[in-house]
Each structure stands twice: as C-alpha cells, then as structure tokens.
Amino acid sequence: MDLNGETSTKRKRSSVAAPAERPAKHLKPGNSTLTPGDATPANGTVYNVEDEEDTGRVMPIGPAQADSPEWQATIEKVVKSVVSIHFCQTCSFDTDLSMSSQATGFVVDAERGYILTNRHVVCAGPFWGYCIFDNHEECDVHPVYRDPVHDFGILKFNPKAIRYMELTELKLRPEAARVGCEIRVVGNDAGEKLSILSGVISRLDRNAPEYGDGYCDFNTNYIQAAAAASGGSSGSPVVNIDGHAIALQAGGRADGAATDYFLPLDRPLRALECIRRGEPVTRGTIQTQWILKPFDECRRLGLTPEWEAAVRKASPHETSMLVAEIILPEGPADGKLEEGDVLLQVNGELLTQFIRLDDILDSSVGKTVRLLVQRGGQNVEVECEVGDLHAITPDRFVTVAGGTFHNLSYQQARLYAIAARGVYVCEAAGSFKLENTLSGWIIDAVDKRPTRNLDEFIEVMKTIPDRARVVISYRHIRDLHTRGTSIVYIDRHWHPKMRMAIRNDETGLWDFSDLADPVPAETPVPRKADFIQLDGVSQPAVADIVRSFVRVSCTMPLKLDGYPQAKKTGFGLVIDAGKGLVVVSRAIVPYDLCDINITVADSIIVVAKVIFMHPLQNYTIIQYDPSLVQAPVQSAELSTEYIKQGQETIFVGFNQNFRIVVAKTAVTDITTVSIPANASAPRYRAINLDAITVDTGLSGQCTNGVLIGEDGVVQALWLNYLGERTPNSHKDVEYHLGFATPALLPVTSKIQQGIIPKLRILNMESYVVQMSQARIMGVSEEWIQKVAQANPSRHQLFMVRKVDCPPPQFTSNADSLQEGDIILTLDGQLITRVSELDKMYEKEVLDALIVRNGQEIHLKLPTVPTEDLETDRAVVFCGAVLQKPHHAVRQQISKLHSEVYVSARSRGSPAYQYGLAPTNFITAVNGVSTPNLDSFVREVSMIPDNTYFRLRAVTFDNVPWVVTMKKNDHYFPMSEYVKDPSQPLGWRTVSHERDRHKDGITPDAANLNPDAMDEVYEEVSDVEPEVD
C-alpha cells in the first residue's frame, strides 16, 4: 500500500477467502480453506502470525520455470527438513494478542530435535503447538529459546516420535549469503501445500524492517531478495544450491513489490551452538538502537574525512556505518551517547557491522565496554556497563481481577523511547478494562500507591478487598503525555485468584502458582445523598421523576446467550423504592451471570441482583438493598392506560454523557414490531411488542428514559433494544423505542407482592397483517367486520412469522402453529392487539381459532414455561463456552441437533485453533452420542490431557461435520458454571479434573477473558500492524 508516497512492508500472511453473502454461521470448515467471515481456517489455524493491518496484496507468483537438475536434487533434500508449525499463543502477552496461527520452520538438529523459526512464531508469551513434517507425521513442539530482540526462536520436538521418515537437518551457513546468490525459499502455503519460490539476493545491508506497533527486530542488518514469499512462509529456510540454509524468511513488502527480507543466520547459529552445549545464550545490551546509515548521511552528522578514510581503507566494501538512533532513558548509555552519534570503535576495535557489535556485547554481560563515537565532528569516548538483555525481557506475568500484567518489555520501551520499567497491562479486561482498549496501558499507581514494577503492583493488589473501588493512575504507551485517572471496581469474587505464571524453558510451559487469596469484601454501610435539581424546567413532574432514575452497570464474567459485550451501562427506573425494585432494559442486563451495580443520585453505589427477566419484551427487574440508600428515592407511578398515537407527552431521557435531557413532544406512531434477528449468531431480542416513537430528535440520542404526562405519571419506558450486527461494519445496531407501562403492571404487581412470575408463552413470533392481506389468505368477511369493530384504530390480525423449535416435552401429535397461520381468537377472544396475547402467560393450553390455507381450524395450543428457556448452566471446555440452546437459538432454528451448543470461544484456545465455531452443535464425542451437557462432560472427562479426540458437530444450517481437537488441560482446564440460588453470587463454579469435581474453579484458572472471546464468526483484524 502506498501511504503518502511511502512504501510499507509486511510479514507474509495466508490469503483469506472472500466473505460469503450468507451468514458465516451457515458454513463449516472444509479441508483446506478458511471459513468465510471467520478468522479460523478449516485446517485449524486462525490467521497467519505474520498478518498485518495493511490490505496491500502480495504479488502473485507466475508459473515457475523448470529448475536445473542440481536445484531439483537440492530441493528434494531440503523439503524433508521443513515443517509446518501450527500454534497458539494462549493469552495476550507483550506486543501480541492471544491468537492461533501457523508458520514454517526447519530442522537444524535432527538428533536433539531442534527447529529454527521466527521469534514471532515462538511467541513471547505462552506457546502451545505442534509441527507437521513432509510425510505428514505430527509431533508436539515447545520453545527452548526465543531471542529478546532478533526475529528467531528455537523449538524442540521428540525425534523418536517421527517413525516413518529419516530425519534430516539443514546446516546453517550464514557466510554463504552473498549479493547475486541464487536462492530458494522453501515454505508452507497455509500448512497444506509446499511452496518453493526462487529469488536472487540483492542486498546484505538493509536495516531491519519496522512492523509498526507490534514486535520489531532491530540492531541487525537484513538480507533483501526478490522472492515474494507467500502466506505461511514465515520461518522458512532460505537455501542455496548446496542445500545449506543461508538466511531465515522474516518479512516482505506490502505494496505488491516482489521483495522479501531475510534474517542473517549468524546469531541463530551462535544460539543453537550454546543450546547444544547446554550453555545459556547470553545477550548483552546498552539499551541503544543502532541503524546503518550510508557515508553521505554520516558526513552530514559530522563524520570527519580522516575517519571515513580509515573506515574505507579497513573495509573497502563497506558503504555505511552504525549510527545511534534511540538511547533509552535510565539505560547504561543514557547521558553518555546521543542520537546521531556515529560509532567508530568498541574496545579499540574499528566497527561497522551489527554482527561484531552483537559479539562484543553478548560476551560482555556485566562488564564495561569503551565506545568511541563522533558527535558533530568531535571524538567522544564513553564507557558503558553492558546489561543483561534477558533481564529486561519479561518471562512472567500475573493475572488478578480479570487483567493480565507484566513488566514493561525492552521491545515496547525501544519502540516508544521510554525507560524499560513499569507495569504493563497486556490484557486489559475485568476490573482493568480501561477505556475499551485491549492492551497498552502502563499502571503508575493503584490505590494512591506507586507501582513502579510488577512486584510492587502485586503487593498493592494483595491488600485490596473484593468489591473495593480504588483510584488508579495510568498512561497509554502510545500517548505518554496524557495521564489518566480512573476508579476501578476490584472483582475478586468471579476472579478470586491472583496467579503468577513463570516461563519454564525446560518444559516449554508456563508454570502457574497462586499468590494470595482475596481479601473479603467490606460490609457496605448506608450512605446519604441528594438528587440534582433541574434548573429552567417548567414542568414540576420532570423535577420529581429525576428521583426515580438510577444508573445501572452490568458486568458479565462469561459470554453467554450470544451477547456481544462484557460490560454495559444504562439507566433504570425505580418502581418500588421501599423494596428496591428497578426496571431496566434487557439489552443492559441480558442474563443473571453478572455483577450489577446501581448508582443512586450520582453518589451512592450499591449491589443489585436479577429478580425477573421477561422472555419477549426486553426488560429485566433487578433489586437492591434500600436500607443502604439514605436518599429521597421516589417510586415512579406507572400509568394503567395505554398511551395513544398523537397524544402529547414529555420525553425525559439520558444522553451519551449520562446527562438528563427533556423535551415536550407527541407520539408519532405505535407499531407492532419484532427486533430483527442477528444473522451471524442468535441472541436475545424483543418480539411481539408495540413500539412507541415520538417526534423529537432526542429520542435517537437517548438510550434510556421515560415518557411522562403533565401529572408525572409514567406512560412509557424508553428502552434500548439490541438488534442485528451489520455485515459490513460488524457493529451492533441498537434501537431506541418506547414501551407502554400498562404491559409491565401484571408482572410488577406480583413481584411487589413477593411472587416471582413464572410465565408461559406460545413458541412463535408473529407480525401484523392488514385486512387486504387477510382477505386474500382466507379470512372471511365476517371476521374482517369483527376486527373493524374490535379495534377501530388499527384494523389488523397477527400472522405467524416463525415457530420456535418445540421443547422436548412437546409430543409429536400435539397441536401446533405453523408459519403462515393467521390467529383469530385465543380462548374465545379476538386478537387484534399485542396486549391481548398476554393471556398466554398464565395458561398451559390455549383454545385457538386460526386460518390455515384458507380454512378455519380449532387448535389446543400448549404453552412453553419460560424458566426452561433461560440459561442455568455453562461448560467451558478447551476454550469453548457450551450451553443449552438459549431462547434466541430456538427462535431461529427449526431443529435442535443436541443440547450442547457452542456459544462463544476464546482466542488462542484449542477450540479456536481447530475450528469449533460459535453456533455449532456438538452431537458426539469419539463416536459416543452426547445429547446434553451431562453426557458431554462425562465423555470428555475420560479423555487424557494432550490427546486428540473427535467431535461430531452440526452447523446452524444442519450440515454435519467432524472436528479433531487436542485437549489442553494446562492452559484450558474444563470448568462449569451452575446456577445455584443458595450461593452468594447465585452461581457456583466447578472444575472437572480427571473425573474429580472441585468447587471454586474460576475464570482465571480456565484462562477466560470475555473480551477475548468471539460469540460469532467475524473477520478479525490482523494482529500485525502496518510496516513502514
């Protein structure tokens, strides 16, 4: 891509199939293609790790000419050493988000089982993966080394696991890389087809490419060649005609030019030899970035003719020198070197190459080196103590209150030229979800105490009680000029454990340990507050209604029911101040596995719980403890009369700044609607309700509010309704509509009496038909006249749009509605208004008269108990959230294939890697039928860790397929959430460890972060940023 005249480079990525017109949920992975609309390829990869946000295309390779016999013989030997690497980074760490991907590597020690690949493949954080050899044998791999700076890492495999081919290794010959040398890049295209691309080395002295905000290599030269390597080629060997590896594929141009960049193998060869000898791979640093600059630029920086002549005489082929680009504050060179210094000598040795500089620094850790530089034509000699590069590269992280933290890395510090210290938020989730940004925050202080490093942060967090609200001070690494201050709610009940993870290079795993139990929450105390007074508002009723509003914040620790967010805030209306009852939109409180906090008078914060959720009409009733609120809260008076079209009313709402706004207006329309279904993944939506619209622009700006009369009586609630996700922008649509209060009264009156209604509903969705349509469909003139008399304002009947999938208790011979039926009467009453359908709420069977295919038919329609439709259990397995199909699924599907429904999945998990997608149904495990969650848990509990198993699944559109998956209990242990009213949170958590049940497992132990979970197929943006 050409950006203002500049070209950009990128790491190679697998091509992604074009999105299909049909919703992605209707598709299943095939054998070798990506699933359209999803980031999960069919073969179990998600996106190539070299992906980046630039949309520039790699130049397609034309038909290759036949290679010479020498090259053919070489390639035949080389391909046996090349492997396809499939891997996950199981959680976000440093510059990388959690992900599943693939790349290439090659065997460099067949006896010990070492594979060389890129550092961005080996990952800075927790790695889990396997490799596939040329003969399609597979074995597990784990990292033994990842370089802190340079783009290479070493994986280890068990050579004895390869039984059907003789292992061969490639010799590393970095000295064989020369300008004009003919090369072949031998890699894997999406892990399926061997890709052999030819090229010629054109440069040996290119500076390392910049990859934007992600991981970047530096302090090394790169080799440039014309090859245009394809997706999945990251980590491929660059070989010469002798069959020796002379470089490592790393990156390329994103503007379509057939140019690639390779890492020289000098430092990988040294690291491999150290590992073979069992020695540590020492890495030294003075925390300075150097770049190569040609002599003409060096002269402008002050290089004298005498020194230029000396350099050219000592190295006749050199055309550039090393120049200081970035000196990190508080580093060994801070105050000694300056940007623009031209490096002349190190320890008295004339030096112009990165390789020799690395040699000296890596062998001088803990020692002092002398550097001679030229600064503005003057010789300057300094001494710097060489630090340990591994010491400023994080190898541990801590999770607490839903967030993940580690010390700021040298990578990030170099990128933004800041000191390599501080607490870095690599996964901003849970209590630490700051400003809706996933990562990049530096925490300066918590609870007014400084947190200069991870150890200080841990000690502070150990002392903070559950449910405490503390002040934190933070900055974003991209904007260090702005210091933010926020109050965070510390969640140590859904996330009770503070866990430390430490990298273990012997096993390749990250070892977890618990640091501290949570400090119990403090007992809440009553607090006083006064409501604001509205100045300049002429209606007294508006001034009073302010005392009936509270702010509602809902946080979900786990994604269920297809709901797309982990936190939602809005406003609710107090309907009984004495009992603490509040009605709020169900788009704000979608299910009861959540934390609800209510703010009264912008001052008092109290906890609330879910009392009732309406299955169709988009409202939830919650309850707080009124004894904790010493404020003049007023119960809103709800109208018993339905508001009418054209009637004047007062609109009172809250805008996006949570400020109250008022407008006198009129009702423009009252229409029977159903909120559109979300095509990509079913989720709760309101159906069969009369929606009110008003004649004011404020109605579209306000998510919550009320319509009130001059007497202060609430005529309608103003609610936000969650709608569909747009296919192009992938944003969720919200509708803002009024809901008449008389429809609330039957439910609220019972709750005020201490009775929780257990509603029953007809399992169908309807829409309005006018009399012209009804007559054509067979409704008689007699009934048309009756409709006109029964409802003079709206001559309408209701037609069945969709019949929900019937529950298991329905018998096959029971009467049922069908799509296209027109409902005339229920229990003898003509149905012309939505409110007249409410009679179904308390009836097990309804006598119905319908018109079907032009004939009037009498039916005995059974109703469905709504408590069976709400989610009361969830199983988290291999990163997938499994639950019984919720109501929205039943509304949109005609047949339930099982009661094991995939609701969401975590990025970087086995479910993500192997393509088990949301909206799939699991019907069998290893050939054993699993019709429900009990049978599923029983079968998967018998599967050993790190073992493959088969899942038979069915897509939402009834297409069966089989997925093979490998179990991972270390990073993704199975856990379960079960609704339990006896528990303080209303839910209990259970762990399943080798047939043992253990209460108290938490999302922390199950490696869950709802913000890193997908509830739908979607096109995920590339993890790698643009490259300049």
UniProtKB/Swiss-Prot annotation:
CDD domains noted in UniProt: cpPDZ1_ScNma111-like, cpPDZ3_ScNma111-like, PDZ2-4_Nma111p-like
Enzyme class: hydrolase
SMART domains referenced in this protein's UniProt entry, alphabetically: PDZ
Localization terms from the record: Nucleus
Chief location category: nucleus
Biased composition (Basic and acidic residues): 991-1001
Keywords (A to Z) from UniProt: Apoptosis, Hydrolase, Nucleus, Protease, Repeat, Serine protease
Domain PDZ span(s) in chain numbering: 289-374, 876-957
Function of the molecule: Nuclear serine protease which mediates apoptosis.
Protein name (Swiss-Prot/TrEMBL): Pro-apoptotic serine protease nma111
Encoding gene (name): nma111
